[in-house]
Amino acid sequence: MKIRYKNSKNIIDYLVMGICYFKNNKKPYYLIEEENKIKWVSEIYIDIEKSKMPFNWSISLGNNSKYDFLCGYYELCNLPEHFEGIISRNKKDLEIFRKRKNELEIWLEKLDYYNKEITFNDILSKIKF
């Protein structure tokens, strides 16, 4: 999923690595990396650009004191220490985050490639007579 985040400086597209409904909060927050800082941003500041959800994302439903709903890559949803570690900038957790982000970028590129509209002229242009 990609979002367009309107920060104080400008408008930039970001890759979403997780979606969270924190305890006692009815609005979703999106996990992004901005200028090498990982943070949760409120839906108030974003527009969703591409809403395709990765097939391998996990879901965690309120089995802790921090959130009621969490959706994202495996470690984010299944390892509470990783959830905390990415915000506290633990080196190991940042490596996992960046690895999963890279995998998601590759997946989105492939998805974009296969979702392109192919016309008859496109096919003909590839054929050599």
Q: Where are the predicted features?
A:
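Residues located in well-ordered beta-strands
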Residues: 13-15
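Extracellular beta-rich ligand/substrate-recognition surface
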Residues: 7-9
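Basic/aromatic-rich interaction segments and small domains that mediate binding to polyanionic partners
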Residues: 2-4, 17-44
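Intrinsically disordered, low-complexity, charged/polar segments
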Residues: 38-93, 97
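C-terminal charged interaction modules
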Residues: 77-129
